Amino acid sequence: MNSETLPAELPATLTIASRESRLAMWQAEHVRDALRKLYPACDVKILGMTTRGDQILDRTLSKVGGKGLFVKELESALADGRADLAVHSLKDVPMELPAGFALAAVMSREDPRDAFVSNDYASLDALPAGAVVGTSSLRREAMLRARYPRLDVRPLRGNLDTRLAKLDRGDYAAIILAAAGLKRLGLAARIRALLDVEDSLPAAGQGALGIEIAAGRADVAAWLAPLHDHATALAVEAERAVSRALGGSCEVPLAAHAVWRGDELHLTGSVSTTDGARVLAARAQSRAATAADALALGRAVSDELERQGARAIVDALVAASAQAQKGGA
């Protein structure tokens, strides 16, 4: 496709809304470069923005409003026309988009695993009792408490560079990060070990980039279509369906990961208490050819988790989080 074959109504300029962290800008530039290659006559620009999630660094996301803190400002730019599309790490996108917005494209996935990063130790198993390990998510915290109760797990906020700086100055013996971000920024050498998905099930959408637009922008959706990876989209749709059905958010240690094995999509979902004392898991697979198939697969896994008691865990955690937010207001 070239500019001569594009519908006349499509704009000559596209503006991408992005957070201003180094990783977020890399992701936006990745999309910009792909669009420029597809449409060299189009002027593709990036609008860097600071979100509320970037500004609140003294509390965990579960205590200040969750994943929506990273996308609301970008959605405002889509709504008022300052931007045509917004690029997100899909794991940071709420399971239910606000009315008036749509996920137009999901790009091919980077490594979805969690990474162990340390200057002094080769793995989680090598850490001594009482070693301080930093993590930004309740999901990883629950995993660490379940598998490594001897460790001192503490919150870790800030962008990727800030987290690494906190490790380097000695605040933590080790930290757990998404492997995808490290690899995208050329920091794979910082990874001491990659955690197997059986040991640390990733968050829904981890490693995938999602491109959001204002609903009704069929022109922008058409331009983004070549960037859409169908296999990745079905996998993350199934993952997000698990979280959506259970009301998953930053308040809940909920994980979901789907992988293709031949023509079958294999999905695993997990819910746990924050202390790791109780961990529920469910699996299912299907020949998911459509988004509806992926949704059904996700629902099968969420239904099984509910049969195991996941709803009671989720409801208790959401209630506790609401009380904590009320108390801190």
Swiss-Prot record:
CDD domains: PBP2_EcHMBS_like. It comes from Burkholderia thailandensis (strain ATCC 700388 / DSM 13276 / CCUG 48851 / CIP 106301 / E264). Its EC number is 2.5.1.61. Monomer. PROSITE patterns: PORPHOBILINOGEN_DEAM. The porphobilinogen subunits are added to the dipyrromethane group. PANTHER family: PORPHOBILINOGEN DEAMINASE (PTHR11557:SF0). Keywords: Porphyrin biosynthesis, Transferase. One of its GO terms (biological process) is protoporphyrinogen IX biosynthetic process. Tetrapolymerization of the monopyrrole PBG into the hydroxymethylbilane pre-uroporphyrinogen in several discrete steps. GO terms for cellular component: cytoplasm. InterPro entries: HemC (IPR000860), Porphobilin_deaminase_cofac_BS (IPR022419), Porphobilin_deaminase_N (IPR022417), Porphobilinogen_deaminase_C (IPR022418), Porphobilinogen_deaminase_C_sf (IPR036803). GO terms for molecular function: hydroxymethylbilane synthase activity. Pathway: Porphyrin-containing compound metabolism; protoporphyrin-IX biosynthesis; coproporphyrinogen-III from 5-aminolevulinate: step 2/4. HAMAP family: Porphobil_deam (MF_00260). The modification S-(dipyrrolylmethanemethyl)cysteine is found at C250. This is Porphobilinogen deaminase. Binds 1 dipyrromethane group covalently. The lineage of its organism: Bacteria, Pseudomonadati, Pseudomonadota, Betaproteobacteria, Burkholderiales. The gene is hemC.
